[in-house]
């Protein structure tokens, strides 16, 4: 039984040594004309390119609205009632939200979020 603490310590050191800080970076702002398209970018920090993210929208005076979960392979699942004009894609550590045929109600803050585990 003397090996148990050593094994635990080895696993603990391995886990803590493999952690690196996860940071999401978004493009600061974007603008486009009604009817046009816009592409927003969320970049995962080095070593986290396999992570999924979620895109959210927050219109003025309203709570956040879940738009979609976006995986590293570009597959995504949208929230209820999200129009087809909203789509997601991925390339390496970058996750994109594209809004096509912009409408006035699309004027909002958009932000990305992750859960801190690779998927």
UniProtKB/Swiss-Prot annotation:
GO biological process: adaptive immune response; immune response
Domain of life assignment: Eukaryota
Region (Framework-3): 77-112
Keywords of the record: Adaptive immunity, Cell membrane, Disulfide bond, Immunity, Immunoglobulin, Immunoglobulin domain, Membrane, Secreted, Signal
Region (Framework-1): 21-45
Region annotation (Complementarity-determining-1) ranges: 46-52
Region feature (Complementarity-determining-2): 70-76
UniProt entry tagged with the keyword Disulfide bond: yes
Protein name (Swiss-Prot/TrEMBL): Immunoglobulin lambda variable 4-69
High-level lineage: Eukaryota, Metazoa, Chordata, Craniata, Vertebrata
Gene3D superfamilies per UniProt: Immunoglobulins (2.60.40.10)
């Amino acid at each position: 039984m003397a090996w148990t603490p050593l094994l635990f310590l080895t696993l603990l050191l391995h886990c803590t040594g493999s952690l690196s800080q996860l940071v999401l970076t978004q493009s600061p702002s974007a603008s486009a004309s009604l009817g046009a398209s816009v592409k927003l970018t969320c970049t995962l920090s080095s070593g986290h390119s396999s992570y999924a993210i979620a895109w959210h929208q927050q219109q003025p005076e309203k709570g956040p609205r879940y738009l979609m979960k976006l995986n590293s392979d570009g597959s995504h699942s949208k929230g209820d009632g999200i129009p087809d004009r909203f789509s997601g894609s991925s390339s390496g550590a970058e996750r994109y939200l594209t809004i096509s045929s912009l409408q006035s109600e699309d004027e909002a803050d958009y932000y990305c979020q992750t859960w801190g585990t690779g998927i």
